[in-house]
């Protein structure tokens, strides 16, 4: 699939440095550049996700990692921290009625989806280590409602429920239902 071209060069030379780039991006993140940083991170993550779905079978990559021997970069603590920071920055800008509301809503949904995927992959990679798995599971359980509830506030209940469904997290889904019903009563 990769051949001798620029794709192979990228995967051999640049990809090993992705975590360093993400760490540097996180260090530079502030309110003035959050939208641009989010665009960059989402382009990278969505491109990688598309590549995995299109070519994963060729490289015998499972859709979700299942062994601790291979922890994908997108499931690293560095990537998860950056996704959460971008999510918080985007949510904050939405709360302050930023001029680019439509883009921010789209970004918030995409960041929630990518963060949930990263948490899921992180949890799957720790199955052989009970202590690490318990920590990853607890972090994921804590993050799910924090990533999904804000989607209700921006009128994206459809995305919140769609993202919650695959995780079989009944508690969060009930919270979403109750919060959504409460918002409807307020109207």
Per-region residue spans from a language model:
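Extended alpha-helical solenoid scaffolds
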Residues: 1-187
